[in-house]
Amino acid sequence: MGISRDSWHKRYKTGATQPVPHKKRKFELGRPAANTKIGAHRVRLVRTRGGNEKYRALRLDSGNFSWASEQTTRKTRIVDTMYNATNNELVRTKTLVKGAIISVDAAPFRQWYEAHYALPLARKKNAKLSEEDNAILNKKRSHHTMKKYTERQKTAAVDALLIEQFNTGRLLARISSSPGQVGQANGYILEGKELDFYLRKIRAKKAK
Protein backbone atom coordinates (compact mmCIF):
# COMPACT_ATOMS: atom_id res chain seq x y z
CA MET A 1 0.00 0.00 0.00
CA GLY A 2 1.41 3.38 -1.00
CA ILE A 3 1.06 6.60 0.99
CA SER A 4 -2.15 8.29 -0.14
CA ARG A 5 -3.49 11.83 0.38
CA ASP A 6 -7.16 10.95 -0.18
CA SER A 7 -9.89 11.39 2.45
CA TRP A 8 -12.16 8.48 1.59
CA HIS A 9 -10.08 5.94 3.53
CA LYS A 10 -11.20 7.68 6.76
CA ARG A 11 -14.33 6.62 8.62
CA TYR A 12 -17.46 8.76 8.97
CA LYS A 13 -18.08 10.46 12.33
CA THR A 14 -20.66 7.74 13.02
CA GLY A 15 -17.92 5.10 12.73
CA ALA A 16 -19.11 3.70 9.40
CA THR A 17 -16.56 3.06 6.66
CA GLN A 18 -16.85 5.13 3.50
CA PRO A 19 -17.40 3.38 0.17
CA VAL A 20 -14.27 3.12 -2.01
CA PRO A 21 -15.07 5.24 -5.11
CA HIS A 22 -12.03 4.21 -7.17
CA LYS A 23 -8.52 2.83 -6.99
CA LYS A 24 -5.71 5.03 -5.75
CA ARG A 25 -4.74 7.73 -8.23
CA LYS A 26 -1.31 9.12 -9.06
CA PHE A 27 -2.41 12.65 -8.12
CA GLU A 28 -3.30 11.44 -4.61
CA LEU A 29 0.14 10.07 -3.83
CA GLY A 30 2.16 11.03 -0.78
CA ARG A 31 5.86 10.52 -0.07
CA PRO A 32 7.72 9.54 3.11
CA ALA A 33 9.03 12.44 5.22
CA ALA A 34 12.57 13.63 4.48
CA ASN A 35 13.54 13.69 8.20
CA THR A 36 16.43 16.06 7.44
CA LYS A 37 19.30 15.63 9.92
CA ILE A 38 22.34 17.75 10.80
CA GLY A 39 25.36 16.52 8.83
CA ALA A 40 27.43 16.86 5.67
CA HIS A 41 25.35 18.33 2.82
CA ARG A 42 23.24 15.64 1.11
CA VAL A 43 20.31 16.65 -1.16
CA ARG A 44 18.33 14.47 -3.59
CA LEU A 45 16.21 15.52 -6.57
CA VAL A 46 12.58 14.32 -6.67
CA ARG A 47 10.47 14.49 -9.83
CA THR A 48 6.95 15.71 -9.05
CA ARG A 49 3.66 16.14 -10.89
CA GLY A 50 3.95 18.19 -14.08
CA GLY A 51 7.66 17.45 -14.47
CA ASN A 52 8.49 19.89 -11.68
CA GLU A 53 11.21 19.19 -9.15
CA LYS A 54 11.58 19.17 -5.38
CA TYR A 55 14.86 19.07 -3.51
CA ARG A 56 14.80 16.53 -0.70
CA ALA A 57 17.45 17.51 1.88
CA LEU A 58 18.60 14.44 3.82
CA ARG A 59 21.55 16.12 5.60
CA LEU A 60 22.29 19.83 6.05
CA ASP A 61 25.01 21.58 8.02
CA SER A 62 24.40 25.26 7.18
CA GLY A 63 21.77 27.73 6.01
CA ASN A 64 21.05 31.39 5.27
CA PHE A 65 19.68 33.24 8.29
CA SER A 66 18.50 36.83 8.35
CA TRP A 67 18.99 39.30 11.19
CA ALA A 68 15.81 41.30 10.63
CA SER A 69 16.53 44.34 12.83
CA GLU A 70 19.88 44.84 11.05
CA GLN A 71 18.47 43.95 7.61
CA THR A 72 21.28 41.54 6.81
CA THR A 73 21.53 37.85 5.96
CA ARG A 74 24.49 35.56 6.53
CA LYS A 75 25.26 31.94 5.74
CA THR A 76 26.07 30.20 9.01
CA ARG A 77 26.63 26.77 10.51
CA ILE A 78 23.71 24.90 12.12
CA VAL A 79 24.82 23.62 15.53
CA ASP A 80 21.84 21.90 17.18
CA THR A 81 18.05 21.67 17.41
CA MET A 82 16.72 23.28 20.58
CA TYR A 83 12.92 23.21 20.51
CA ASN A 84 10.02 22.03 18.39
CA ALA A 85 6.41 22.91 19.18
CA THR A 86 5.03 19.82 17.43
CA ASN A 87 7.14 17.00 18.78
CA ASN A 88 9.99 16.52 21.29
CA GLU A 89 11.09 13.46 19.32
CA LEU A 90 12.20 15.79 16.49
CA VAL A 91 14.46 17.62 18.98
CA ARG A 92 15.92 14.38 20.36
CA THR A 93 16.71 13.09 16.86
CA LYS A 94 18.00 16.53 15.72
CA THR A 95 15.55 16.71 12.81
CA LEU A 96 15.39 19.94 10.78
CA VAL A 97 11.83 20.90 9.84
CA LYS A 98 10.01 24.15 9.09
CA GLY A 99 9.28 26.03 12.32
CA ALA A 100 12.02 24.25 14.32
CA ILE A 101 14.02 26.37 16.79
CA ILE A 102 17.73 25.72 16.29
CA SER A 103 21.02 27.19 17.48
CA VAL A 104 23.40 28.59 14.86
CA ASP A 105 26.97 29.88 14.96
CA ALA A 106 27.09 33.59 15.89
CA ALA A 107 30.52 34.32 14.32
CA PRO A 108 29.35 35.50 10.83
CA PHE A 109 26.88 37.95 12.39
CA ARG A 110 29.46 39.31 14.84
CA GLN A 111 31.98 39.79 12.02
CA TRP A 112 29.41 41.66 9.94
CA TYR A 113 28.33 43.89 12.88
CA GLU A 114 31.90 44.83 13.82
CA ALA A 115 32.82 45.60 10.20
CA HIS A 116 29.61 47.60 9.65
CA TYR A 117 29.66 49.69 12.85
CA ALA A 118 33.37 49.53 13.79
CA LEU A 119 32.24 48.63 17.33
CA PRO A 120 32.98 45.49 19.39
CA LEU A 121 29.94 43.25 19.96
CA ALA A 122 29.60 41.26 23.21
CA ARG A 123 33.35 41.22 23.91
CA LYS A 124 34.85 41.28 27.41
CA LYS A 125 36.72 44.43 28.43
CA ASN A 126 40.47 44.27 27.76
CA ALA A 127 40.00 40.96 25.93
CA LYS A 128 42.78 40.10 23.49
CA LEU A 129 41.72 40.53 19.89
CA SER A 130 42.93 38.39 17.03
CA GLU A 131 44.93 40.14 14.29
CA GLU A 132 41.93 40.00 11.97
CA ASP A 133 39.53 41.53 14.55
CA ASN A 134 42.11 44.12 15.56
CA ALA A 135 42.52 45.17 11.92
CA ILE A 136 38.76 45.80 11.66
CA LEU A 137 38.09 47.48 15.03
CA ASN A 138 41.28 49.56 15.43
CA LYS A 139 41.92 50.37 11.78
CA LYS A 140 43.07 53.91 10.97
CA ARG A 141 40.29 55.63 9.05
CA SER A 142 40.05 58.99 7.35
CA HIS A 143 37.94 61.77 8.85
CA HIS A 144 35.37 61.35 6.07
CA THR A 145 35.09 57.58 6.71
CA MET A 146 34.84 58.07 10.49
CA LYS A 147 31.97 60.48 9.93
CA LYS A 148 30.09 57.69 8.12
CA TYR A 149 30.74 55.21 10.95
CA THR A 150 29.75 57.75 13.63
CA GLU A 151 26.43 58.24 11.86
CA ARG A 152 25.88 54.47 11.71
CA GLN A 153 26.74 54.02 15.39
CA LYS A 154 23.68 56.06 16.40
CA THR A 155 21.51 53.03 15.52
CA ALA A 156 23.96 50.32 16.65
CA ALA A 157 22.06 49.27 19.81
CA VAL A 158 21.48 45.51 20.17
CA ASP A 159 18.82 43.78 22.29
CA ALA A 160 20.18 42.70 25.73
CA LEU A 161 18.93 39.12 25.26
CA LEU A 162 20.73 38.95 21.93
CA ILE A 163 23.98 40.21 23.49
CA GLU A 164 23.74 37.36 26.04
CA GLN A 165 23.52 34.96 23.12
CA PHE A 166 26.49 36.52 21.33
CA ASN A 167 28.48 35.96 24.55
CA THR A 168 27.84 32.21 24.26
CA GLY A 169 28.74 32.19 20.55
CA ARG A 170 25.36 30.66 19.63
CA LEU A 171 22.16 32.33 18.40
CA LEU A 172 18.64 30.92 18.47
CA ALA A 173 17.00 30.90 15.04
CA ARG A 174 13.79 29.61 13.47
CA ILE A 175 13.71 27.67 10.20
CA SER A 176 11.22 29.28 7.79
CA SER A 177 11.90 27.15 4.70
CA SER A 178 10.92 23.50 4.15
CA PRO A 179 14.19 21.53 3.99
CA GLY A 180 12.43 18.45 2.58
CA GLN A 181 11.01 20.44 -0.34
CA VAL A 182 13.48 23.21 -1.20
CA GLY A 183 16.66 21.46 -0.03
CA GLN A 184 17.72 24.36 2.21
CA ALA A 185 17.35 25.28 5.88
CA ASN A 186 16.88 29.05 5.72
CA GLY A 187 15.36 31.16 8.47
CA TYR A 188 15.76 34.13 10.78
CA ILE A 189 17.42 35.02 14.09
CA LEU A 190 15.00 35.24 17.02
CA GLU A 191 14.72 38.67 18.65
CA GLY A 192 12.60 40.60 21.14
CA LYS A 193 9.42 38.99 22.49
CA GLU A 194 9.75 35.95 20.24
CA LEU A 195 13.24 35.22 21.59
CA ASP A 196 12.04 35.72 25.18
CA PHE A 197 9.11 33.32 24.56
CA TYR A 198 11.29 30.50 23.22
CA LEU A 199 13.97 30.98 25.90
CA ARG A 200 11.26 30.45 28.53
CA LYS A 201 9.99 27.35 26.68
CA ILE A 202 13.50 25.87 26.49
CA ARG A 203 14.17 26.59 30.19
CA ALA A 204 10.84 25.00 31.18
CA LYS A 205 11.69 21.88 29.15
CA LYS A 206 15.12 21.57 30.81
CA ALA A 207 13.62 22.03 34.29
CA LYS A 208 11.34 18.97 33.86
Curated annotation (Swiss-Prot):
Subcellular location: Cytoplasm; Membrane; Nucleus, Nucleolus
InterPro entries on file: Ribosomal_eS8 (IPR001047), Ribosomal_eS8_CS (IPR018283), Ribosomal_Se8/biogenesis_NSA2 (IPR022309)
GO molecular function annotation: structural constituent of ribosome
One of the protein's GO biological processes: translation
Example of a GO cellular component annotation carried by this entry: cytosolic small ribosomal subunit
The entry's keywords: Cytoplasm, Lipoprotein, Membrane, Nucleus, Ribonucleoprotein, Ribosomal protein
Membrane topology: Lipid-anchor
Pfam families with a match to the protein in the record: Ribosomal_S8e
Subunit structure, interactors included: Component of the small ribosomal subunit. Identified in a IGF2BP1-dependent mRNP granule complex containing untranslated mRNAs. Part of the small subunit (SSU) processome, composed of more than 70 proteins and the RNA chaperone small nucleolar RNA (snoRNA) U3.
Family, similarity comment: Belongs to the eukaryotic ribosomal protein eS8 family.
PANTHER family: 40S RIBOSOMAL PROTEIN S8
Role: Component of the small ribosomal subunit. The ribosome is a large ribonucleoprotein complex responsible for the synthesis of proteins in the cell. Part of the small subunit (SSU) processome, first precursor of the small eukaryotic ribosomal subunit. During the assembly of the SSU processome in the nucleolus, many ribosome biogenesis factors, an RNA chaperone and ribosomal proteins associate with the nascent pre-rRNA and work in concert to generate RNA folding, modifications, rearrangements and cleavage as well as targeted degradation of pre-ribosomal RNA by the RNA exosome.
Record protein name field: Small ribosomal subunit protein eS8
Source species: Caenorhabditis elegans
Upper classification of the organism: Eukaryota, Metazoa, Ecdysozoa, Nematoda, Chromadorea
Gene (name only): rps-8
